[in-house]
A protein has these predicted regions:
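Gram-negative outer-membrane beta-barrel domains
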Residues: 1-205
């Protein structure tokens, strides 16, 4: 391997990968206790970019990083028409993180742990069909929570490195209210958690 510079400096990069997880949904009517819980499995592809800064002191590396991801992570469930059918789907169109990093560098490699703030958009589509009539409601809510994970990077040229990374992302609980004609309001507390695995390429300034 050719001689490489250290890890100190700003960098930008791109990444791609996938994610899977669960959206836990608790349903209640007009503030009453929850009457049903639905755990909705979700999975899909992700892709995006990151920007960050590293500071190296001996083998120790400290850093900050922010990323933003486009996502196709989603899940859905349907009930048979007996005589009312219902369809419920949730997706994560985008999400991002802002994290601290701490790692150990040796011979062009960097192993690190990371954690911090996570945020994202949770899109929900709920519909009910009875005979010829269908009622559908679409909501978009912003989730806020935390993330933790780790990864490895290796220098492939003086200013370039590749990376692999795992993150556990918890977007917290958001509350959705559905208003269907001639029916009491339905409240839905949804808690989204996902596991993210991705690979990336960084350019260091």
């Amino acid at each position: 391997m050719p001689e490489m510079a250290g890890w100190t400096g700003f960098y930008v990069g791109v990444n791609a990968g996938g994610g899977f997880g669960t959206a836990k949904n608790d349903f209640s009517i007009a503030g009453a206790p929850s009457f049903a819980t639905v755990d909705l499995p979700q999975k899909g592809a992700i892709g995006g970019g990151q920007i960050g800064y590293n500071w190296q002191a001996g083998p120790a590396v400290f850093g900050i990083e922010a990323d933003l991801q486009a996502s196709s992570i989603k899940g859905s469930v349907s009930t048979p028409p007996l005589p009312l059918s219902a369809n419920y789907s949730q997706e994560l169109p985008w999400f991002g993180t802002a994290r601290g990093r701490i790692g150990y560098a040796q011979a062009g490699w960097l192993l690190y742990a990371t954690g911090g703030y996570a945020y994202g958009r949770v899109k929900t589509v709920a519909s009910a069909t009875a005979g010829p009539a269908t009622v559908s409601v679409t909501t978009n809510e912003n989730g806020n929570g935390w993330t933790v994970g780790g990864g490895a990077e290796v220098m492939i040229a003086p200013r370039w490195n590749i990376k692999v990374e795992y993150l556990y992302v918890d977007l917290g609980t958001t509350t959705i209210s559905y208003a269907f004609p001639a029916l009491p309001a339905l409240n839905n507390n949804t808690h989204v958690t996902i596991n993210v695995a991705r690979a990336g390429l960084n350019f260091r300034f």
